[in-house]
């Protein structure tokens, strides 16, 4: 069971927008990107295609940047997503 803490749909940002959370966030974070972004995952900066999604566990480092205007959906949620 999990609880949605905050959510935004089709949220706009300016070109160059970045999130840099070296220690992550205290909640799960789900992101859906309408356009291409660069995501740091497993130590590598990777260009993700439009409509890519990523789910971060609490405390997982988060970094992404959009070189163009960005539109994205995001959800912060807490709880146990294991289903156990």
Model-derived regions, located:
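Generic protein-terminus/edge-of-domain signal
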Residues: 1-49, 60, 66-69, 80-83
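Glycine/small-residue-rich loop that forms an oxyanion/phosphate-binding "nest" at active or ligand-binding sites
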Residues: 75
